[in-house]
Amino acid sequence: MTRIRFTAAYDGRPYLGWQSQPGGRTVQDVLERAFSGLFGTTCRIHGSGRTDAGVHALGQVFHADAPDTHRIPADKWPAALNTRLPRTIRITHAEYVPPGFHARFSATGKTYRYCISRAPILNPFDAGLAWHRPLAWSVDILEQAVHLFRGTHDFTAFAALRGNEPRPIPEGYFRRTITQTQVAQTGEHVFITFTGTGFLYKMVRLMTGAAHEAARGKITLEELARLINAPLPDDKSPFCAPPDGLTLMRVHYPEETFGDKKKIN
């Protein structure tokens, strides 16, 4: 078997998220069916992490183990798979990697981008791709609020619970590091970018929702800073942005040089 690392882009609107579920309407399920059809046998893939229903990706990473009988040049893999995939899922990159590489456990961080539309009337082509917030709010305050998340914090207030957390929850379980943040406006769109070493369930959407509440003047920057820097055990931010505007842009890995590697444009 030969291990291959793939990068995938997908429109999350038709799917119930990344992770396989009964019924098969997830990105992972669709990809696994494409691999199994190509290999003639069941194939499991392993992603860098989950994306929720309606969340998009331009840089999701997963790995698969291909039979040695199917070793082809890396730049041939995207075409071989894309012909078996719906137009809402594309393989954009493939490379052979050492057997110890793991899409999830080898990752060192991720970058997410959230899109907000300020248009008075939402462009139909933004439906499901941007959060429509046409009422008055301050991009400057939004930027200040977003930058408060930089650094290492206990993100208790900005994490939803899946129900499968360890009990009791260990100390430091909600601690994460946000290394970079950015807010940029292009026309009627505002883009918020977070890069971090790891993200909790719904963390980006909860951070975005809280920052937007500050931009609307519904909470102060001081109140937001307290939730970030000194959360109480039961603190939970109630402001969760919808999945529509969220895109996984990139999964980060240590600098490595793999063998047969080519960027697919």
Curated annotation (Swiss-Prot):
GO molecular function: RNA binding; tRNA pseudouridine(38-40) synthase activity
Gene Ontology biological-process entries: tRNA pseudouridine synthesis
UniProt keyword Kinase present: no
Enzymatic class: isomerase
CDD domains: PseudoU_synth_EcTruA
Isomerase found in the keyword field: yes
Sequence similarity: Belongs to the tRNA pseudouridine synthase TruA family.
Protein name, as recorded: tRNA pseudouridine synthase A
